[in-house]
C-alpha cells in the first residue's frame, strides 16, 4: 500500500486508533491495546514526578491499572525522600472480596527499592469503596512495621 493510499485509508477510519502489526501494516487497535498505551503514558508521567502535586494523575493511573479487575489487588507506590515516584508494584492478588497482605513482604519490598515513603493501594471490585475494619487494621499494622525501617506511609487508597 502506498503512502498516499495509506493516508486515505487512515482518514476513512479516523474514529479508530491504529497500531502497526508485525508485518508493518496498520490495523485498528484492540481496546486492551489502547488501555495499555494509556497506562504506559500515565506511568511515564507518574514516574519521577512530585506525587502529592498531581493527585489526579495518581487517580487516573490507578483507575486504569485497577479499575477493570475482577479480583482484589494490593499494590504500593514507592516514593523517594522528595516524594517522587520510584515504582508502582502490584504485590498481592486475591478474590473478589479479599486479598491477603503480608507486612513482612511489604517491608522487604520497601527496603529493596530504598523507599523513603509509600502509598498503599488496593481496589474494591465488589463496588464498596469504604474501608472496612480489616482495611483500617491493615493500614495501622503496615504503618507500624514500615516505621521500624523509617518508611513513612503517605496514604492508603
Language-model region placement:
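Active-site-proximal loop/helix of nucleotide/amide-processing enzymes and allied scaffolds
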Residues: 2-35, 57-60, 82, 92-157
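Long amphipathic N-terminal alpha/beta scaffold segment
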Residues: 29-91
Amino acid at each position: 500500500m502506498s503512502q498516499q493510499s495509506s493516508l486515505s485509508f487512515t482518514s476513512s477510519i479516523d474514529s479508530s486508533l491504529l497500531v502497526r502489526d508485525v508485518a508493518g501494516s496498520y490495523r485498528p487497535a484492540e481496546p486492551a491495546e489502547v488501555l495499555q498505551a494509556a497506562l504506559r503514558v500515565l506511568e511515564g508521567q507518574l514516574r519521577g514526578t512530585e506525587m502529592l502535586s498531581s493527585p489526579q494523575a495518581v487517580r487516573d493511573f490507578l483507575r486504569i491499572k485497577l479499575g477493570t479487575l475482577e479480583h482484589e489487588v494490593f499494590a504500593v507506590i514507592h516514593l523517594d525522600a522528595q516524594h517522587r515516584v520510584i515504582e508502582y508494584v502490584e504485590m498481592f492478588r486475591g478474590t473478589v472480596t479479599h486479598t491477603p497482605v503480608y507486612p513482612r513482604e511489604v517491608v522487604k519490598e520497601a527496603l529493596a527499592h530504598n523507599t523513603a515513603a509509600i502509598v498503599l493501594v488496593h481496589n474494591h471490585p465488589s463496588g464498596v469503596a469504604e474501608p472496612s475494619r480489616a482495611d483500617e487494621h491493615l493500614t495501622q499494622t503496615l504503618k507500624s512495621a514500615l516505621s521500624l525501617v523509617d518508611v513513612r506511609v503517605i496514604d492508603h487508597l
